[in-house]
UniProtKB/Swiss-Prot annotation:
Residues 134-143, 183-195, 207-217, 349-380 have a biased composition (Polar residues). Residues 258-273, 293-304 have a biased composition (Basic and acidic residues). Residues 2-85 form the PDZ domain. The gene is Pdlim5. This is PDZ and LIM domain protein 5.
Length: 591
């Protein structure tokens, strides 16, 4: 290796150009030289490889990094180069190291490949998958797969590294296509011997194996056609049209009996999953013979209606009853009557429909701030009783919540207090379940099943204890605040009490102004007490610089000449028709 060092005295230009870099997958080399330049005078040649720049190795540098490194050398440029004659020998190896991965090579059709396949065709696990009796031609083994012509060389080598039974499978489409027949154990069912009796009867019962075998039969037929015609056109996959026309013997249905012929020619209901209410095909054929087909269909329709109607009716009736109990808790109408009317479509003698009961009311609408009295009614149809408790707070955004009563059912939740399974009716509050007797106030220990509660500092308190110990007092009405609190003027207020004096609307968290100790919203304050700038017609807020001129108030930046917009603050100005003018335009402009 003939390496040499070059030291070029600054400043730039250095008289050469670079090419390559890590981002181009090429070494940094000299691409051109300027005649009479500094690099040419230092005997630098075109094609020399740059090994280092200013003592830093250039092997990992990108093209831009190398340029910036050279630009940073202002006083002198020191480089280590390698002659192009010595670097030319190792150049092709380094550049073309990754090219074999990108070269697309078609699989050649050679005679050694035929001999290799024919030598292994006697093995039992290397037989060609034949689609139920079709005879495959030995010529097809020498025809490559259409997709193998587009397979990279490294993919071909990886396929040869697989075990011999898998690599020696005769039809290449099974290993190259997306059918996964070589990796799927069920594909071995396709290679049935040709002497199998009556194979076509099982075609509708095995859709997966049939699709795999039809694909392989299609590709074998396509390979035979291209091999006989000498077609060299490469495709990106086997054609998938006219499968029935090319492989008509595969879809041949033997006429051994009228029953099997009728099963294959009629509709394909066997492909659908059967339920307990649908009759078998033999039963329907018998019904057609005896003339009772329409009678059975009407009975089946009634059975389907009986099975499909009660389940939604229970789900839809229980939210309806819950909604009725929320809107009119004082009504004495039994909720069970609504369920019975919804389940009136149950046919006589049907045992698959359960009698209406309080099994699924836990799917009703969530709690809306009132007590759901569904727990007080049992399956016997006892009338509901209205909730007894303190009056509802007047705050619309109150913090007081109510527990939701859930009757006993299939669900067995865990109590949030004792961490035990709840057997029977329970309460739902704050996303947790509670025993009714354990949902008590943290201070007075009274039950909160039928009264409101508030969560404060991780504990639950009834609304009376919360109002007594925690709720702040309103600065206007002197009542306890159970909802949103407004903190203003060092006091706490109800939202409905802290309002604008002029318009009476709640100020909430908006900006307000005080005038004579009374709060005003921003709009009313500037309309009543604010000063409007004559120039911009916007209010002059507190802290704004302003001046008075021509009988009006102006922002200091708004008092300008009406013609040239020059600021007139602290200067002599003139007025024509109440418009300020500077000295230049005072006598030259007429309005």
């Amino acid at each position: 290796m003939s390496n040499y060092n070059v030291s070029l005295v600054g400043p730039a230009p250095w008289g050469f150009r670079l090419q390559g870099g890590k981002d181009f997958n090429m070494p940094l080399t000299i691409s051109s030289l300027k005649d009479g330049g500094k690099a040419s005078q230092a005997h630098v040649r075109i094609g020399d490889v740059v090994l280092s720049i200013d003592g830093i190795s250039a092997q990992g540098m990108t093209h831009l990094e190398a340029q910036n490194k050279i630009k940073a050398c202002t006083g002198s440029l020191n480089m280590t180069l390698q002659r192009a004659s010595a670097a030319a020998k190792s150049e092709p190896v380094a550049v073309q190291k990754g090219e074999p991965k990108e070269v697309v090579k078609p699989v050649p059709i050679t005679s050694p490949a035929v001999s290799k396949v024919t030598s292994t065709t006697n093995m039992a696990y290397n037989k060609v998958p034949r689609p139920f009796g079709s005879v495959s031609s030995p010529k097809v083994t020498s025809i490559p797969s259409p997709s193998s012509a587009f397979t990279p060389a490294h993919a071909a080598t990886s396929s040869h590294a697989s075990p011999p039974p898998v690599a020696a499978v005769t039809p290449p489409p099974l290993s190259a296509s997306g059918l996964h027949a070589s990796a799927n154990p069920s594909a071995a069912q396709c290679s049935s011997p040709p002497n199998t009796g009556k194979p076509a009867v099982h075609v509708p019962r095995q859709p997966t194996v049939t699709s795999v075998c039809s694909e392989s039969a299609q590709e074998l037929a396509e390979g035979q056609r291209r091999g006989s015609q000498g077609d060299i056109k490469q495709q990106n996959g086997p054609p998938r049209k006219h499968i029935v026309e090319r492989n008509t013997e595969f879809y041949h249905i033997p006429t051994h009996s009228d029953a099997s012929k009728k099963r294959l020619i009629e509709d394909t209901e066997d492909w659908r999953p059967r339920t307990g209410t649908t009759q078998s095909r033999s039963f329907r054929i018998l019904a057609q013979i005896t003339g009772t087909e329409h009678l059975k269909e009407s009975e089946n329709d009634n059975a389907k209606k009986a099975n499909s109607t009660p389940e939604p009716s229970q789900q839809s009736a229980s939210p309806l009853s819950a909604a009725e109990s929320l809107e009119s808790p004082g009504s004495n109408r039994p909720v069970v009557a609504g369920l019975r009317s919804a389940a009136a479509f149950k046919p006589v003698g049907s045992t698959s429909v359960k009698s209406p009961s309080w099994q699924r009311p836990n799917q009703a609408a969530p709690s809306t701030g009132r007590i759901s009295n569904s727990a007080s009614s049992s399956g016997t149809g006892a009338p509901m009783k209205p909730a007894v408790g303190p009056p509802q707070p007047s705050d619309q955004d109150t913090l007081v919540q109510r527990a939701e009563h859930i009757p006993a059912g299939k669900r067995t939740p865990m109590c949030a207090h004792c961490n035990q399974a709840i057997r029977g009716p329970f309460l739902v509050a704050l996303g947790k379940s509670w025993h009714p007797e354990e949902f008590n106030c943290a201070h007075c220990k009274n039950t909160m099943a039928y009264i409101g509660f508030v969560e404060e500092k991780g504990a639950l308190y009834c609304e009376l204890c919360y109002e007594k110990f925690f709720a702040p007092e309103c600065g206007r009405c002197q009542r306890k605040i159970l909802g949103e609190v407004i903190n203003a003027l060092k006091q706490t207020w109800h939202v409905s009490c802290f309002v604008c004096v002029a318009c009476g609307k709640p100020i909430r968290n908006n900006v307000f102004h005080l005038e004579d100790g009374e709060p005003y919203c921003e709009t009313d304050y500037y309309a009543l007490f604010g000063t409007i700038c004559r120039g911009c017609e916007f209010p002059i807020e507190a802290g704004d610089m302003f001046l008075e001129a021509l009988g009006s108030t102006w922002h200091d930046t708004c008092f300008v000449c009406s013609v040239c917009c020059e600021s007139l603050e602290g200067q002599t100005f003139f007025s024509k028709k109440d418009k300020p003018l500077c000295k230049k335009h005072a006598h030259s402009v007429n309005f």
